[in-house]
Structure formats: structure tokens, C-alpha cells
Amino acid sequence: MNIFSKSNLFVEIVGSVIFWYPYIMSIIWMAGAIIFSHYREKEDNIDLNKYKWPRISIILPCYNESETVEETIKKLSSLSYPGYEIIAVNDGSSDNTGKILEELALKYDKLRVINCLENKGKANALHMAAHAAKYEYLICIDSDAILDDMAPYYLVRQFLENGERVGAVTGNPRIRNRDTLISKLQLVEYASIIGLIKRTQRILGKVMTVSGVIVAYRKKALMSVDLWDRDIITEDIAVSWKLQRKFWDIRYEPRALCWMLVPETISGLWNQRVRWAQGGQEIIFRHAGIFKDWRQRRLWPIYIEQVFSILWSISWIAFSALTIFTAKYRQDILVFFSFSAFALSMLSFIQLFISIKHESVYDNIMKYYIWASWYPIFYWIINAFVVVRALPKSIMSTIRGGYATWKSPDRGTIDNDEEKESTVYTVKSKQKIVGKVIAMLVNVFMSFYMFLVVYLFISGCLGYNDSFIGIVKSAMKITNDDIRYLSLNTIRYFVLSFLILFVWKLYNLKRFGRLNRRKAPNNTTKEEMLSLNLVNNETYDLLQSEKVIKFKHNPIRELGNVR
């Protein structure tokens, strides 16, 4: 039976929710980012002589990274930070990553290598590195990433300045490969969406996750939550929630830059996003009990938003399918989608310029923003399909349990023959002619579309009409009154969001900001690490003392046998 044959009230209600959720969330992200930038992102240069910089351990988990790991270690070895060690862990790679690491250990004094022939996943590799680390502060980066020279200073400073309660500090990932259509879209996504989200979440007081590609941990904090979860596919999301539930603070430091490679194929991007969504959903299942504890209330907004995101994704796909194939009111649906596309496109353009204000300080990427200012619209569509695809995987993974092992990621098609200065982190990609042509056509079409949107918006606000505008408005079923309605509501919701977040920030500062509930913890001792019952005394001593150590089997106690 046609569910819309009796009345289109259901269509209107569901359609309104589907439209207003991404619209309101985008406005909230913009408001939160502005507040964060004003209070915590003012330009400043670190006085390197002001602090007594503690020694740090830089951890590099590796799996099938033979093409990238040497460059990463070379860059790490030349950092200006006064005292650090590098610990690279090969987690059962099927290529020659282990051999390369052992050779590099002979070349670089700061490098220590753990070569485990059994693949047990990234979290397990981090367990090995944490037991091998000699210092209290751990900086973890991906083995294809390049750490900016000033990044360790910015990360560590967060622990030193009123950071007694800080358990982790997440940095600001930047994209190295930015030539292909897919990599350019991700470049815009990280800056105009992910960057705004992280800033807003910090205003709320909690974050959904650290960035696994660049994050600094306090070892004492990690030990208090039994390190990383080895049975969840996204160990960075999992440990973020564990730390925050133990009342450790997680900070976002956008000045700590790390340059990474991103997927350049549709399948690679799809697999990455499904993995992220699956990990987020596994966290939702695992931490459903936070509503039983009033002390966890600052995590509630993050949790609720994640649940609503899942429900929205399912609703959007179901709504779209039903309205296309069964709805009686196809004309109304056409008008709805036309207006929604226009509204979200205009908001994407505004979001673009706000993100430019924040991100242009760190990376000259304005030309990419103009090129793909329309991407936030597609972000919501892509995310809907990703969330729905990941849902059964996360349910099955939660039921089955076991190690969350990793697969070889898509790092793009990098031109390794390209010569570049040591301070240039971006790289060229090997593109086929077809890919270049497709990217150019998409660029031309979407640029023209965004021009129409902006032109239509300005003319609607000013009440201007001509023959061209009339044709466009008629085709899109939009009137000047619709545009004015949209403009006024955008302003109202932005002001309301700004005020709510501003008051929330003041409350957080007064209620939590100056509390001294936890004195600066002492450095983690050997006895404390052994108390986790993950390695025996002999293995711990080997991990601490050997420059290169090889394990045929996993030295970390198996899942199910801990404590």
C-alpha cells in the first residue's frame, strides 16, 4: 500500500527532520568554531626557553608501510625537539616493512624497532610501544605521516600549562596528496567540516575522538584505562571515551600539524569511512550506560548527536527511496529536494568562508575551497550510506569480539620520483588523463552551480528579478519569500547557537576549568605498567632495553586472559 496515499503529513514531518538536522548542525559547528578560535586559537609563538621540555616517546605503528615509513622516520629524526626517542612497531606486515625498519635502526640513533611477526592490530602494536616507551608523554602518528617540526612543542605544552587533568591532546591533520578529485574533496572536508566539529566539541567540553594520525597521550592516563581497546576497529575513538569517562581531559591543538596521505580511490575512501563509522557505532554500543551517571553529563551531547546521526542516515535513505518509488506527492517531493539543495548549498558556501578564516593560517588551501565549496552537501549524503553500511558490521563485531586487525590502506598513487625541499610536505599524485578530465568537468559544473546559488541568494535577499533569475527560480521552485525566510532563520539559529555555546563555555570554565581535583601525576613506574598484567617482567625489560627486538608471536597477553 502507498503509505503517502492518505496524507502527506508524514512526508512533511520526516522531510523537515531530514532537512533541518544537517542544517542546524552546520550552524552549530560554525558558531562553536568562532568561539573556540577567539578564546583558544589566537596566533602565538611558543617561547622555547619558557619551559623545561620533558623527554617524549614518538610511537609509529606500522602495517605494510614499506613505501612510506622511511620518509616518515627520516623526518622524525630531524625534529628540533630537545629530547625524544622513536619507537616503530611492525605489526605482522606481509611486505618488507620489518626488514626496512631494522635497517633504519642502524642508521638512526633515536630509532628503536619492535618487529612482531604476528598481526594483531594497531591497538596491540600500541600496547607493545607503550611498554617499550621510556618517557611519560607519548606522541602517536601514522607511519605514512610527516610531523611538523613545531608540533611536539604545541602538544606537550598543553600538558605543562594547567594540564594536570589532561590525558590526551589531539593535533590537526593536513593532507599531503591533493591533486585528484577525491583527495581535494577530503582536503575541504578536513578543514571545513572535521576542523569545525572538533573546535565545537571542545567548546562543549568533550570530544568524540582524538585524531589517530596525530595525538599525544599521558602514559599515566592510558594506564588508568588499561591502554587501548584491542577489540574495537578504531582504537582512537575507543580510548577517547575511556579517558573522558575517567574524567581525563582531551584537548584539541590546531597548531600541532601533521601531514598525511589520504585515499585517492572511491573504494579506498569508502572502506576508510565505513571503518570509522563502524568504530563509532561500536563505541555507542559499549558506552550506552553513561546516562546512568550524572557525572558523565558532558558526554551526553556527543553521544546523543552520534545516535541521532545514525537515525538520520537510516531515515534519509528510507525516505528518499520511498518518495522516489511510492510517493503520491512527487511534485511536493521535487520542491522539497530542490529547496533543500539550495539551502544547504548556500550554507556550505558560508561554512566555506568561516573555515577559511581558521584554516588559512595553517595551510594555503583557499584555491581548493573555492573549487569544492559544494562538498559539505555531499558529505551528508555519503555519510548516510556509510553509516547504514557500517551498522550491521558494528553489530556483528560487537557480538563476535576478538582482535580488530587492520588491512593495507589506500595511500594514493604518489610520485616517489618527485624532488622537493625538506620543508615541503605536499606530494604529487600519478593521475590518469581520464581522472583529470573528470575532475575538470566536475569543477566546471559545480562551480557554475555554486555561482547560481550565490547569485540566486543575493537576488532573493535584495528582491531583484530579471529574466535569467526568473527562469532559475521557476526551475528550482523557489521564490524571494523562500530565500528571505531561509536567511532570517539562518541568522536566528546562528545567534541562538552562538549564545547557547557561549553560555555553555562560561559554565564549563566556572564549573570545571579551575578545579584542582587531580594533582600533577607522577611519571608511570615499571611496577604500575606490570600491574596491567599485559606482559611479564622479562618481556618488559626486553622492550625497554633492546634497540631492535623481534617477536615470533604476540608478546602482549591474549584477549580474554588479562587480569
Regions found by a protein language model. Name each.
Residues 1-74:
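N-proximal low-complexity "stem/linker" segments adjacent to membrane-targeting elements
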Residues 31-55, 289-302, 326-425:
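Juxtamembrane C-terminal module of membrane proteins
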Residues 35, 109-115, 123-125, 129-131, ...:
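Long helical/loop segments within the catalytic core of UDP-sugar-dependent glycosyltransferases
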Residues 54-57, 85, 238:
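Cell-envelope/extracellular polymer assembly enzymes that use nucleotide-activated donors
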Residues 70-71, 95-104, 150:
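Acidic helix N-cap motif at the loop->helix transition within catalytic regions
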Residues 74-83:
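Short, acidic, metal-binding catalytic loop of nucleotide-sugar glycosyltransferases
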Residues 82, 90-99, 118:
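A conserved acidic beta->alpha catalytic loop
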